[in-house]
Curated annotation (Swiss-Prot):
Binding annotation for substrate: 74, 177, 198
The protein's name: tRNA pseudouridine synthase B
A biological process term (GO) from this entry: tRNA pseudouridine synthesis
Stored PANTHER family: PSEUDOURIDYLATE SYNTHASE TRUB1, TRNA-PSEUDOURIDINE SYNTHASE
Family (UniProt): Belongs to the pseudouridine synthase TruB family. Type 1 subfamily.
Keywords: Isomerase, tRNA processing
Keyword Isomerase: yes
This protein's encoding gene: truB
GO molecular function: RNA binding; tRNA pseudouridine(55) synthase activity
Function according to Swiss-Prot or TrEMBL: Responsible for synthesis of pseudouridine from uracil-55 in the psi GC loop of transfer RNAs.
Active-site residues annotated for this sequence: 46
Length: 312
């Protein structure tokens, strides 16, 4: 199975990343199972974290940055009274304090962390300094000055606290570091805190129910060995369309000659009520997505980002 020739695979897989492996490790496992030539993930999850890790195959990667800009939802459990070197349970405990809190103090602290807030990215992160990820400096005991970032915490809900644990769900903008938010919460409560459980539930408009596990892919592989069915055909059916990351954009349809010219990178005349907007361009002859275009005020459709003609 793993000696198959690499394939041209195109589409989006919503992977349910398991705990204990890096996002890149999860990507490589899935890429190998699909025997895919090209694939990349969107939105790094720490080894501790589980949940939604979108993987873009082939031409889908051209549109992946739209997902990078999207909001995300997480389920978080934090342990109070202990601050760690990594702000999660993978690190070592560097400070312990008594937990002297009540429900009012918790709600007040979380309210302060809702809305537009400032965060300093943690040293244990993939952000690069002089081309080197910060976590590599951190492992050497170095502390690099990081710029303050503004992030938007839309909502913190389903709050539950019992003994030294606090649980909640957070809906936030791109670039939010949940570990940093939990550490800041611990400081506001005066006892310290770190993440012991983190799961990404949603990203953009994708739902938790759409996730696919690595174990399920292996189950299909074992089934192929025991039964006569096409493994690749089965797993390719799990992929979402190439234009899935831009599904929020309106569609426009082109006739064959228009479609041909558009795919050559030529501007085409197009009458529409849509003005000054990006649109998904669909070829009428086969109903396939051929790229993104922008309709200007002069009723012209200008190519913006094209799907390779070789797959249409």
């Amino acid at each position: 199975m793993f000696f198959h020739k690499k394939r041209d695979v195109h589409g989006l897989l919503l992977l349910d990343k398991p705990q204990g492996i890096s996002s890149n490790n999860a990507l490589q496992k899935v890429k190998m199972l699909f025997s895919a030539k090209k694939a990349g993930y969107i939105g790094t999850l720490d080894p501790l974290a589980t949940g939604m890790l979108p993987i873009c195959f082939g031409e889908c990667s051209k549109f992946s940055h739209y997902l990078m800009e999207s909001n995300k939802k997480y389920h978080v459990i934090a342990k109070l009274g202990e601050k760690t070197s990594t702000s999660d349970s993978d690190g070592i405990i560097i400070k312990k304090r008594p937990i002297l809190i009540n429900s009012f103090k918790i709600k007040s602290a979380l309210k302060e962390l809702t809305g537009l807030i400032e965060q300093i990215p943690p040293m244990y992160s993939a952000i690069k300094h002089n081309g080197v990820p910060l976590y590599k400096y951190a492992r050497q005991g170095l502390n690099i000055k990081r710029s303050i970032r503004k992030v938007l915490i839309h909502d913190i809900s389903s709050i539950h606290q019992e003994k030294n644990l606090i649980e909640f769900k957070i809906f936030c903008s791109k670039g939010t570091y949940v570990r940093t938010l939990v550490e800041d919460l611990g400081e506001k409560l005066g006892c310290g805190a770190h993440v012991i459980f983190l799961r990404r539930l949603e990203m953009a408009s994708y739902l938790h129910s759409q996730l696919v596990t690595i174990s399920y892919l292996h189950k299909l592989l074992r089934k192929e060995k025991n039964n006569n069915f096409n493994f690749f055909e089965k797993i390719d059916n799990l992929l979402m369309p190439i234009d899935s990351p831009v599904s929020f954009l309106p569609k426009v349809y082109l006739f064959p000659q228009q479609s041909y010219n558009f795919q050559l990178g030529q501007t085409v005349i197009f009458f529409s009520d849509i003005k000054n907007s990006l649109v998904r361009v669909i070829a009428l002859e086969n109903n396939k997505f051929i790229g993104l275009g922008r309709i200007n005020t002069e009723e012209l459709l200008i190519p913006y980002r094209l799907v390779s003609r070789s797959i249409n």
